[in-house]
Amino acid sequence: MTIARRPSCHAVENSIGLAAPAEAVFDYVTDVRREREWNPQLREAEKLTPGPVGVGTRYRVRFGRGVGAAIIENTAFDRPRGWSAVSTSRRLDVRFRGQVTGLPGGCQLGVQTELSPRGALRVFSPVLRQLMRRSWDKDLAAIKAIIER
């Protein structure tokens, strides 16, 4: 999967190499119910749609740090290469793309997060972008530690 759209100035891109098969990494990171294992900001995640994870899968989630409740929906799903999702909340909408590239001995996990803050939160866009970049660096390191156990 390639990222066709050019990211806005509010987009954050992060990546990490993993010593694990692309399929295992993809399956782990695309199931939002498992995100609490590596994202300390996620408090709750409930899958709202029946069946396997794929396009149209929706989750109700609750984050800490002022984001609160959100609905996440997968908008593209190309196992094990890439996926896209949107998250809608009262204060912040997020467009997300993930890409898993197979490499000798493992894979590369890349994520792109595009933030669309609402209302007064818009003035904090540069700060939000920096927080998101740091948060993804920590989250990717946690994913790596879990996957490579």
Predicted regions and their residues:
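Glycine-centered tight beta-turn/hairpin loop motif at sheet-sheet or coil-to-beta transitions
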Residues: C9, R65-V67, R91-D93
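Short beta-edge strand/loop motif at the mouth of beta-sheet-based domains
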Residues: E13, R33-A69, F77-G82
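Hydrophobic/aromatic beta-strand elements that line small-molecule binding cavities or substrate pockets
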Residues: N14-I16, K47, V61, A70-A76, ...
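Hydrophobic pocket/interface hotspot
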Residues: A24-V29, E35, Y59, N74, ...
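Beta-strand/loop substructures that line and gate deep hydrophobic ligand-binding cavities in soluble
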Residues: S84-K138, I143-A145
